[in-house]
Amino acid sequence: MKIRSFVAGVTLAIATAFGANAETWRLAVTDVEGMERLQLEWGPFKEALEAATGDTFEFFAVNSRTAAAEALRGETVDFVVSGPAEYVVINKLTNATPIVGLGRPDYHCAIVVRADSGINTVQDLKGKKIAFGDIGSTSNMLCPMQVLADYGIDPVNDVDKIHTSRNIAHEALKAGDVDALGSNAGSWLRVRNGETDLPYGFFKMIARSGDLPNDMIMVGAHVPADAAEKVQKAIIDNKASIIAGITAHEENDKYVGMDLVEIEDSAYDYVRAMYSNAGYPQFDSFIGD
């Protein structure tokens, strides 16, 4: 009886000590609106995160990028999953910093034209009409504009630009209503590969970017550095289970084949250059909001 009591006491003491060291954090995802979608699409990730850290994570739903920034600034959310373009603005507004990069395979953009267009180089696009994706998107707007700038074309003044959905841009290029499109390369290829009635060489990519900076998990400036480092280490040390949690739902298929890596703010300087070349040199507000 005494042995049982002793074992029970030790178990209780360990559990109490573990619980005393555990924290409760609030977690947001910038491109997922509503608690129901958060639970469905990111619930397995939250569970894996809790298992890896021993902490509790509570979802905090945000309905916009601005709301995520305000929540970080108001210290009502602690960790945020976001993309590179969003991070650059949120960092400027709140001093939040990245702790883990969500390395996506084949995450780059491309400039695409029709093969029969007579357009062979990026310089040939001066004065032409180009379709870009959603305003403010890293890979569908900012990145292709940066590619133009890298080749000496001012994306603000040297081209006639429109913004539309990827599918509409693809149809417009196919019909000759635009001269080129700038898009996330992998996403456009999935649309292109569905066009089984078109010959293989109907389109051509005349330029592509390098691999883009990662999506990331960022931490609010109010979170103690040692606590942020603890979460970072737990994620990296348990990356297999964390990745399995992220990719459990089909809405996160873009992360299939991903890696989790430690990352620093300087990795996003290229995105800051994108903002500047797109005509937003202050990067202190979200484009399109």
Predicted regions and their residues:
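Sec/Tat signal peptide C-region and signal peptidase I cleavage site
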Residues: T16-A22
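An extracytoplasmic/periplasmic, membrane-proximal ligand-sensing/linker region
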Residues: E23-A28, E33-P44, V223-D289
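Bilobed "Venus flytrap"/periplasmic-binding protein-like clamshell domains
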Residues: E23-E50, A85, H108-E171, D253-G257
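Beta->alpha turn/N-cap motifs
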Residues: V29-D31, A61-R65, E75-V88, L102, ...
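A local structural motif
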Residues: E50-A61, T76, D150-T164, Y200-F202, ...
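A structural signal for short loop-to-beta-strand junctions that line the ligand-binding cleft
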Residues: N95-G103, I206-A207
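Pocket-lining segment of extracytoplasmic ligand-binding domains
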Residues: S117, K129-A227
